[in-house]
Regions:
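Mid-domain alpha/beta scaffold segments of enzyme catalytic cores
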Residues: 2-279
């Protein structure tokens, strides 16, 4: 039974690498602090086979925590140095099949393409993305997408393989690209970058994208909001303050935003409904 105290506002961090070593010293305390601030749930995506078990264990050890399984584009070169790429996909398939009965398992991710890091072989990234999208289609799972400087090619493969549900995490595309993803049925994730006044394009997107297509995230320990020092780790307990900025950008109350984002997140990852209540 999932029991939570529902504050005036409640938030779901749709993307946090809560299994990262940065949290090892005070993980439980940090999550308690987040929950005290109204962050009642979080989704922890895997990045490669080496942390498939870890994200599952961390999710089960912390109330309100869920996980996704996938191979991150920034890890594909490491993976292929350790094993044949077909073996990696087979490991992911096996992990998904094992996780399907688990109510804490909610998505396939983090997957996608990265057009920023120079030494990531593009063809290898594409191969892993396509193979993982096939798994998402086969198992009817939403995808948590990494789209840094790669919105158009990711969209191409989503259309090719008929993927219509998921989240474009840390979205930073153009208005046209946002419209394309929204029309495909995807949700767009906004986080710490939104808090910088110089982030005019992201703020414009956050203001104009249909409210029902938005979710919120921290990407902790990365993408620190504006009030943190350079290099300082991000935490899920900063999510309510990020949400406050988003509410201001949208021109709506934090309560209305909270309700909308909760519903959006459950629509983006329907398996959450096995534990989280509707609002």
């Amino acid at each position: 039974i999932f029991l939570i105290f529902l504050p005036i506002t409640m938030w779901i961090d749709t993307h946090t690498h809560f299994d990262a070593p940065a949290f090892d010293v005070s993980r439980s305390r940090d999550w308690l602090r987040a929950r005290e601030r109204g962050v009642v749930a979080q989704v922890i995506p895997a990045v490669a086979p080496f942390n498939f078990a870890t994200v599952r264990e961390v999710a089960h050890a912390h109330e309100g925590s869920f996980y996704a399984l996938g191979i991150h584009p920034m890890y594909v070169m490491t993976v292929v140095r350790e094993m044949p790429r077909e073996t990696a996909i087979a490991a992911l398939r096996a992990a998904i099949e094992s996780a399907l009965p688990d109510e804490r398992f909610v998505a396939l991710g983090e997957i996608g393409l990265d057009g920023f890091v120079a030494d990531l072989d593009w063809d290898t990234q594409v191969w892993f993305l396509r193979e993982q999208l096939k798994l998402a289609r086969e198992f009817d799972l939403p995808v948590l997408l990494h789209v840094r400087r790669a919105v158009d090619p990711v969209g191409k493969y989503l259309r090719e393989l008929g993927i219509k549900n998921g989240i474009a995490h840390a979205f930073n595309g153009s208005d046209v690209q946002a419209d394309v993803f929204v029309k495909m049925g995807l949700h767009l994730g906004f986080g710490g970058t939104l808090t910088y006044e110089r982030s005019r394009q992201i703020r414009r997107l956050a203001a104009r994208v249909p409210l029902e297509s938005i979710v919120i995230e921290t990407d902790a320990p990365d993408i620190p909001p504006s009030w943190l020092s350079a290099g300082e780790a991000n935490y899920s307990y900063h999510l309510p303050r990020i949400a406050q900025v988003l509410a201001q950008v949208r021109g709506i109350s934090e309560v209305d935003l909270s309700v909308a984002l909760w519903r959006n997140t459950l629509n983006a990852m329907p398996r959450l409904r096995a534990i989280l209540p509707e609002v």
